[in-house]
């Protein structure tokens, strides 16, 4: 038996640490697997060794393993074999087709933390270089669904929405969910937090209400009020996806077949019958051309058909932010204002009604081609606002909150136009970087207000942006980013007059 020394450090996998003398006595090396047992619990962990941190007869156990070992005081340790899934990952590297059982084995080992970070990286890299075929992608999706919690609804149809992302200010779920729920359809929207953006849908909803719920609670709220906006990471829905996303982010790659499976596994796990996929398209987005978007749309609809889920994809304009705000509180205030009045930025209104309308048609509430009008009626009548307040209350928020009640960062700075002219370029990536420098999404009150968008007339000295932050130093960092100029960076907004350049360039040109 080894005395347990808990390490209060989360590392995303099961890992233990032995004194080097104990490891040598057992014939173990760093990176080997060991079976760790205590009364009522056991798991397989990756071994690390030390000469000083842990004494002989002791074992250091990191947070994830310590928690699942029921915070045991002592444990037994023995050598464990390598998972068979490692050989299947090598098969993928060698371009060999995998069977359904082999794919299920890989996913199971990902879920149960049986793969080291290096082995997981090898799987992701192999998937990136050698895409899975449609059959393998279906098996991967089903395995991701089956290894986590699932929600089964008694009432149908159940509809859902997903966005490919890449566009700042894409707050449309804050309108789509209440519009669809107000129509009588069920929409259990599980969403992500921002990883590289200025605010995911879960970050936005958290301005109004808690977003961390179990799968059973998501089902209960959805069946009670028609919809929910929850953080998927708080559930055990498609748990393999969370670990894969973290590794993909570290490697800065996004394997295509893995992306397809990730999208559809989450939707299949919540019991969706129909899904609309928002596909922002244009320069600076993940789908820069309509051709790329159409390929993805076909693959998603084909995968949905294999899984028994009806999928429709909507290619949307992604060349500039949706609405005129970026950052959680600012975006929620803008969305809530539109729900209260039915009016607001055209890009936000049009996109929200278009996506909601597609879901109303897919759910049988509206005839083909009539969904937009039906969604607009729900918005203008105030039904969508009332439904969002029901959802907010069901999730533990204040149902009486108004848009003007939402606080934004008190430290603010306007970025002014240097000249008369028109907005001729708008760089989404730079807007996101500025909002993050101001503190978003961690600081819910931080972000950017956009005063001028593509094609709009602007006079010298008029505000282009207002940056909001809760601290002076973050505001200063964000303001500095607006004026950065080098070969690799673009300003967030480019303003040009009608005269772009004069030639020849002499100070006193010749006269006739």
UniProtKB/Swiss-Prot annotation:
It comes from the Archaea. Gene3D superfamilies: 1.20.970.50, 2.40.40.20, Nucleoside phosphorylase/phosphoribosyltransferase catalytic domain, Pyrimidine nucleoside phosphorylase-like, C-terminal domain. Its EC number is 2.4.2.57. Pfam families: Glycos_trans_3N, Glycos_transf_3, PYNP_C. GO terms for molecular function: 1,4-alpha-oligoglucan phosphorylase activity; AMP binding; pentosyltransferase activity. AMP binds at residues 166, 192-197, 201, 262, 286. InterPro entries: AMP_phosphorylase, Asp_de-COase-like_dom_sf, Glycosyl_Trfase_fam3, Glycosyl_Trfase_fam3_N_dom, Glycosyl_Trfase_fam3_N_dom_sf, Nuc_phospho_transferase, PYNP-like_C_sf, PYNP_C. It is an enzyme of class 2 (transferase). It catalyses: AMP + phosphate = alpha-D-ribose 1,5-bisphosphate + adenine; CMP + phosphate = cytosine + alpha-D-ribose 1,5-bisphosphate; UMP + phosphate = alpha-D-ribose 1,5-bisphosphate + uracil. GO terms for cellular component: cytosol. The active site is at residue 254. Keywords: Glycosyltransferase, Transferase. GO terms for biological process: AMP catabolic process; pyrimidine deoxyribonucleoside metabolic process; pyrimidine nucleobase metabolic process. Catalyzes the conversion of AMP and phosphate to adenine and ribose 1,5-bisphosphate (R15P). Exhibits phosphorylase activity toward CMP and UMP in addition to AMP. Functions in an archaeal AMP degradation pathway, together with R15P isomerase and RubisCO. Belongs to the thymidine/pyrimidine-nucleoside phosphorylase family. Type 2 subfamily. PANTHER family: THYMIDINE PHOSPHORYLASE. This is AMP phosphorylase. It comes from Methanothrix thermoacetophila (strain DSM 6194 / JCM 14653 / NBRC 101360 / PT).
């Amino acid at each position: 038996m080894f005395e347990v020394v808990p390490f209060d450090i989360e590392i995303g996998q099961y890992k233990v640490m032995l004194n080097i003398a104990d490891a040598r006595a057992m014939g173990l090396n760093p990176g080997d697997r060991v079976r760790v047992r205590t009364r009522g619990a056991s798991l397989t962990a990756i071994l690390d060794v030390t000469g000083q941190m842990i004494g002989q007869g002791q074992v250091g156990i990191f947070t994830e393993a310590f928690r699942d070992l029921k915070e045991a005081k002592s444990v037994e340790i023995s050598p464990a074999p390598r998972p068979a899934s490692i050989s299947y990952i090598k098969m993928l590297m060698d371009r060999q087709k995998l069977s359904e059982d082999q794919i299920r084995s890989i996913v199971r080992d990902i879920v149960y933390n049986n793969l080291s970070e290096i082995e997981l990286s090898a799987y992701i890299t192999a998937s990136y270089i050698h895409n899975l075929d449609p059959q393998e992608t279906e098996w991967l999706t089903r395995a991701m669904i089956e290894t986590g919690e699932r929600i089964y609804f008694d009432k149908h149809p159940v509809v859902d929405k997903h966005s490919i992302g890449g566009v700042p200010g894409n707050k449309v779920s804050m309108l789509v969910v209440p519009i669809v729920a107000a129509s009588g359809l069920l929409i259990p929207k599980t969403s992500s937090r921002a990883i590289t953006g200025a605010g995911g849908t879960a970050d936005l909803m958290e301005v109004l209400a808690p977003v961390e719920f179990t799968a059973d609670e998501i089902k209960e709220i959805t069946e009670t009020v028609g919809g929910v906006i929850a953080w998927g990471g708080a559930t055990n829905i498609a748990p393999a996806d969370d670990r894969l996303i973290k590794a993909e982010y570290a490697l800065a790659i996004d394997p295509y077949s893995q992306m397809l499976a990730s999208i559809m596994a989450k939707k299949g796990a919540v019991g969706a019958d129909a899904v609309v996929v928002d596909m922002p398209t244009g320069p600076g987005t993940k789908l820069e051309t309509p051709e790329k978007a159409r390929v993805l749309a076909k693959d998603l609809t084909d995968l949905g058909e294999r899984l028994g889920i009806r999928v429709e994809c909507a290619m949307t304009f992604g060349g500039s932010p949706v609405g005129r705000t970026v950052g959680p509180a600012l975006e929620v205030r803008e969305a809530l204002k539109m729900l209260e009045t039915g009016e607001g930025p055209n890009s936000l209104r049009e996109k929200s009604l278009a996506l909601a309308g597609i879901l109303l048609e897919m759910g049988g509430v509206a005839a083909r081609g009539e969904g937009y009008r039906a969604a607009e009626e729900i918005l203008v009548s105030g039904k969508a606002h009332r439904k969002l307040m029901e959802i907010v209350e069901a999730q533990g928020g204040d149902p009486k909150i108004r848009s003007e009640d939402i606080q934004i960062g008190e430290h603010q700075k306007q970025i002014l136009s240097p000249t008369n002219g028109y907005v001729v370029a708008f760089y989404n990536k730079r807007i996101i970087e500025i909002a993050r420098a101001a503190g978003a999404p961690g600081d819910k009150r931080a972000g950017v207000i956009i005063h001028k968008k593509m094609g709009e007339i602007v006079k010298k000295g008029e505000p282009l942006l207002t940056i909001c932050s809760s601290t002076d130093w973050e505001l200063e960092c964000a303001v500095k980013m607006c004026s950065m100029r080098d070969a690799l960076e673009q300003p967030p907004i480019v303003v040009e007059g009608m005269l772009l350049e004069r030639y020849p360039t002499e100070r006193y040109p010749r006269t006739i």
